[in-house]
Structure formats: structure tokens, C-alpha cells
Amino acid sequence: AVSAAAAHADELSDMKAQIEALNARVASMETAPSVPAGYQLLAVSKGEALQVPGMMGSDRDRVTNERATIISVMLTADAPAGTTISWSGYVNAAVVYAGNDDQWKIKGKDADGVQLFTTITISTNSNDDWDVKARGQLRVVATTDTAVGEVGVELKMRGDFAGNGVADVYMKTAWGYWAMTPELTFGGGYAGSLGNIGYGYDGACSCYYTDNADVGFNPGDTSQMRLSYASGPFSMAVAIEDAGIYGGFVGDGSSSNGNQLGVAGEIKYWGDMFSGEISGVYRMVDGNDYTAGTVDLASALTASFDSDVDGLWQVGAGLGFNLGDIASLSLAAAIGSGPFTEVNNYTGEITTSLPVKNDWWGISGLASANLSDAVHAEVGLGYKQRQTDGQSFNVDPDLDGDELKSSGIDYTTWAVLGGIYYTPVDQLTIGLEAEWFTTNYSTSTKATADIEGTDVVAGDKLSLDYEQDNWSVDLVSVWRF
């Protein structure tokens, strides 16, 4: 009996020890962190901004989007960071002085070559335009690691100001993507076209309030779906684009090509000392938008037009050379044909659309040098020529045929810009910028019939030569986070 009691006591002691060990283990589990040592559920840091796969931005975009606040979220204790948010933005303001002077020369001759009137020369000058302009931008990139690969979005929101009044915030970029493999990415949304040449005067300059000349090679931002491939320094992409243009001809509020699509592609190489790209774009047009319509030529004069526009296409290339941290050179060239359009270099919006076909080519370059760790300077030069097809206008609906025939417009632009920028820290830049460009065009129009209600008779010919010089100087400051 004594030995049995001793055995039971030993069993109770062992059981008690096991219960105490279990209690200690449970207590340690309750006090243990939910993630391994050295990790946090939410980490906030400063670093390089996330670059979206397949978004082949310009040199200017790479500089603008260089730094950001990085937010990393860990979903579980045994998994790497599942969601990363890159949050960056800036505000800039500038005192801008701008002006221009232009000269019109108008000549008229009748069918026999006799001068109808003394050559008319009209000169105007506007050199006292002072403004304080400002802009705010917020860029957010969010990525999540999923079972099928990385999925993410990019949102870039802007607001522009020039005096009193609130800004209409607009989306410069709204993009989503799926990295199906480390090399292959499928994306879509609203962004710049792959057909844009992201080098040269327009693609590589800092240009906070310069780059106003028509020497860029941007077909205009648009909604699209894109498939891209990247491996090491080599990348390529192809996209299906919407070819619609909204805003109409001469701002009449109509739209064109609303039921048409386009395609764009790009091949790019990016190395430490050398980079380059070859890009192309083709956008279909709706012939009905260019062969049956009217355009307001003056307050009391409306003409119908009939243009032979088959589609928009452009092929171009860009080259970049880097001399370490000392200097860089960026070159761009392109050739194309299609409807006459002009694009806002800041927003990517097509601001001018005319019902006439034009062919164009151009070349530009930008050189940049680091004068010190905090100071860099740049200078750019650009040239672009446009040649429009001849145009016919039916001014009098009671007469068959076209009473006015235009020879087309020979349109050239020369531009030069420069800037010097002081950046003592990543969050601050102060710069002095300047730009000058000259635009020249010449055209002639001949009457093929007498036009009722005017002094114009068949055979009369009117020629126009126009030259405009434009300049701007600004002191700009940029604050970033």
C-alpha cells in the first residue's frame, strides 16, 4: 500500500509539471509578437518611387517621379510584405513673364496677275504678360503580391492654377497592371501613348513652365490596353488605343474618330551609358468627320470642308548618352502624317484639331550638365516642319463645287530653351528658365467662282505670310514630399 501511494504521488508530480509547462507555453504564445523579430505589420520609409512595369515614361517622368514615401503592409506573419504603396507629390509656383510679336503680310492678285491692293502688313506686340502660375500633383502607386503575380495601380492627379479660382483636378494617369511573369505585364487605363518619343527637347527637359513650342512628337494621351515585355536593359510593348479626339475643330465642341481604334508599339534599351527607343503609332480616322462638315472661319463666315485624311501615323526614335554624373545628351526625331493636331506638352491633351491632312518631320536635342552636386543646367534646340495638303471650301451653298481652293500651309517652328536649377535637397528645387521660339507659315487661296455678297471674283488669289516670335522667362520653385 505504501509503495502504491508513492507511485500515485510520483504520477501527480509528473502531471503537475506537465501542466505547469503547458501553462508557460501558452503564456509565451500569448505574449509573442505576431510577426518575426525585426518585422512590422506597417512600415513607412523614404526611398525611390515605385516604377510601374510596362509604363515606359520619358526622361522627364523618371526625374519627376524619382523619390517617394513608401508604405509596406505585411499581411501575415509568415509572408513577405503583401502590399506596397508609393506616395509622392509636389507643388510648384512660378513668376512668369511672357510675350510675343507677330507680323502678317497679305497680298492679292487677280487672274491676270495684277495686284488687287497694296501689300498689307500688320504687326502686333504683346510683351507685358506677367503671371504667377502654380500646379499641384499627387502620384500614388500601389502594388500587391498575389497568387497569380503582382497586381497594382498608378494614379496621377493634377491641378493647375493661374490667378483667382479653384483648379479642376484632372487625371494625368489612371493605370492598372498585372505582372503575369517577371518579364510579361498586361495593363490598361489612361496614359501617354507608346508612340510618343520620350527624348529630346520635349521628352528630357525639366521644363516646369517652358516647353511651349510645337516641336514635340506626342500623338496625345489616350485610353488603351497594353502588353509589355522587359528583360534586363531591353523592353518592348504594344498597345491598342482609342483614336477618339474630343473638343472638335476650332473648339466647336464636336468629336471625331469616336468609333475608331489605333495601335502603338515601342522597343527600348536602357543602359548606364546609352539608351534608345524606336516608337510607332497608327490611329484610324472616321472619313465622315473630315469629308462632310463645317468650320467657322470668321464670326459671319462658315465654310464646308472636304479633306482626304486616311489616318494618323508616326515613326520616331530617341537616343540618350550619359557621361556618368557629369553630363547627358538626349536626341529625338520623328516623321508622320495625319490630321492636323497640336498637343499640350503638360497634360497630353489634344488642344487643336483641324480638318486638314498634314505631313511633318522634326528633330530636337537637349544637353544637360551637373555644375555641382546641387546645381545643373540644360539647353535644348528643336525644329519641326509641317506641310498641309491643299484644301477646298464651299462658301456659297447655292453654288455647285468649291469656290475657294487653298494651296496648303507650309508651317515651320524653331525653338530654343534653357534652364539652371538649384536642388540642395530632394524636397526643394529653385530654377530660372527661359524659352524662345518662332513660328512661320505661308499659304495662298484662289477663288474658282464669284462669291456672292463679296468683292471676290473668279481668279482672285490671296497669299498670306505669317511670322510670330514668342518668349518666356520664369523663376520657379518646386516643393516635394
Each model region followed by its residue ranges:
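Transmembrane beta-barrel strands of outer-membrane/channel proteins
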Residues: 89-97, 153-159, 188-192, 238-242, ...
